[in-house]
């Protein structure tokens, strides 16, 4: 959950990447941050990249990261954010600083090697 001590940690440490537990809390629960809390956390920590996590692994907490992107785009200029979000997928990876400018992870689409070897099918076209 959000903590006002994020601001202290942001002053005490140089943070490149911060992970924030993001989700839609059901009634009677408050352990995940909301979309605006994720942005507030990143701003308070003075990190360069914020990665929302856990938003897609619990069905009762499931959230949509596009909400963070929408709020980020709406507020980044006015609030002069010095960070940007990165949206991970389960099984994905993020390597800092190599991936520092990426916004989304996308699994490899495959088939980069198409037509590099003879086709091993009995017909020339695939419907």
What are these regions (language model features)?
Residues 1-45:
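Active-site-proximal loop/helix segments of hydrolase catalytic cores
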Residues 8-12, 35-127:
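Binuclear metal-ion centers of metallo-dependent hydrolases, dominated by the metallo-beta-lactamase
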């Amino acid at each position: 959950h959000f903590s006002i001590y994020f601001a202290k940690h942001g002053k005490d440490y140089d943070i490149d990447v911060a992970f924030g537990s993001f989700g839609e809390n059901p009634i009677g629960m408050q352990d995940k941050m909301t979309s605006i809390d994720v942005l507030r956390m990143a701003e308070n920590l003075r990190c360069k990249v914020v990665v929302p996590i856990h938003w897609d692994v619990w069905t009762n907490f499931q959230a949509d990261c596009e909400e963070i992107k929408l709020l980020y785009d709406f507020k980044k200029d006015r609030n002069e954010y010095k960070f940007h979000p990165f949206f991970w997928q389960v099984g994905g990876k993020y390597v800092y600083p190599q991936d520092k400018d990426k916004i989304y992870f996308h699994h490899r689409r495959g088939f980069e090697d198409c037509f590099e070897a003879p086709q091993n099918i009995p017909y020339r076209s695939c419907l």
